[in-house]
Amino acid sequence: MVENQNNNQNQPRKKSGNKIIATAAIFGVVGGLVGGGVSYYAMDQMNNGQGNGAAQISISSSSSKVSEKSAKNGGTMTAAYNDVKGAVVSVINLKRQSASSGTDSLYNSLFGDDSDSSSSKNGKLETYSEGSGVVYMKSNGKGYIVTNNHVISGSDAVQVLLANGKTVNAKVVGKDSTTDLAVLSIDAKYVTQTAQFGDSKHLEAGQTVIAVGSPLGSEYASTVTQGIISAPARTISTSSGNQQTVIQTDAAINPGNSGGALVNSAGQVIGINSMKLAQSSDGTSVEGMAFAIPSNEVVTIVNELVKKGKITRPQLGVRVIALQGIPEGYRSRLKIKSNLKNGIYIAFVSRNGSAANAGIKSGDVITKVDGKKVEDVASLHSILYSHKVGDTVNVTVNRNGKDVDMKVKLEGN
């Protein structure tokens, strides 16, 4: 099971196959080793890590770009680490703790008593979880940091522990759950070094890489592990139903590494560490399989987040569930034909949305988009995300046992 740190819901076990299922799981105090973030019940004080301040690297542009410099065999990984160590930080997710006990909170939640909501809002900020981040740009008086979305998910405030041991407040510039990326900003006066992105298109299996981050939290900030690129472009399916192309590496990725840097021998960030494979779909324990978001995708997303604060993606304007996820007993109640095995059941159609305007109805089953088979939510997203908002796609639905084709103009999310 590929895991990061986004939620702890158990996924149904599937028989072993070629597909890798990526699930998100918060690494909590009762959790197992699942990947990039470390969560604590409470922490009053952060341990300040030691680090050497590097010469300041100033970037005047308001967006990031991929470097044209390529990795050479003669480069040492020690030199590569020195090129990024001042730019890799610990990201601290802070939440306000309610004054009421866990039992009282549960009772109030179940029976609608929100009298303690104000005490929660005014409660003391405490460390909920930790991850890593990379300072990649200095512009307009701000330092910009890329991290994973799940590292800051649900936070009431965010702090950053710099490589020199100083802790500063950070603001969330933008975040995107689909790619699991987020951008933070801090005052530029605290930035002593920025990392440079390499070109992930030219990666090859067997290349030496290092992972830099804060495994187990800020106590082990600036930890570096070494490995190779196991696969430069591995396609996996995440728990949110999206297909994602990632870099596979055997460099050790531990809780707290999420959002940290995967670095080549030229000292360039070629990926943002995000997930690790804890076990296969049949429950077999797995070692040495971790995944990073390719730098070229990171650059595209962070530039958009800095510019707009969010990522706009095309959608149909429907709520769906894969037929494979509908229990047999419910299929007859939903009037799904017994011979229809694969597809996406439409549970809800947004009023005046693109699908509604095209004539799609609740109860329809999407079987194809642009002639391509749609078997699950991941395949639907994969097709839709290859288009832009405003594009028109041909959607084939099964309605009462008959295929119906409709033209749908994609709307934005």
Swiss-Prot record:
Membrane topology: Single-pass membrane protein
Binding site for substrate: 256-258, 316-320
A Gene Ontology term for the protein's cellular component: plasma membrane
Domain of life: Bacteria
EC number per UniProt: 3.4.21.107
SUPFAM superfamilies, per the entry: PDZ domain-like, Trypsin-like serine proteases
Keyword annotations: Cell membrane, Hydrolase, Membrane, Protease, Serine protease, Transmembrane, Transmembrane helix
Catalytic activity: Acts on substrates that are at least partially unfolded. The cleavage site P1 residue is normally between a pair of hydrophobic residues, such as Val-|-Val
GO BP annotation list: proteolysis
GO molecular function, one term: serine-type endopeptidase activity
Active-site annotation: 150 (charge relay system), 180 (charge relay system), 258 (charge relay system)
Keyword Transmembrane appears in the UniProt entry: yes
Main location class: membrane
PDZ domain location: 305-401
Cellular localisation: Cell membrane
TM helices/strands, residue ranges: 20-40
Tagged with keyword Transmembrane helix: yes
Purpose: Degrades abnormal exported proteins and responsible for the propeptide processing of a natural pro-protein and for the maturation of a native protein. It also plays a prominent role in stress (heat shock, ethanol, puromycin and NaCl) resistance during active exponential growth.
Protein family according to the UniProt entry: Belongs to the peptidase S1C family.
Protein's recorded name: Serine protease Do-like HtrA
Lineage: Bacteria, Bacillati, Bacillota, Bacilli, Lactobacillales
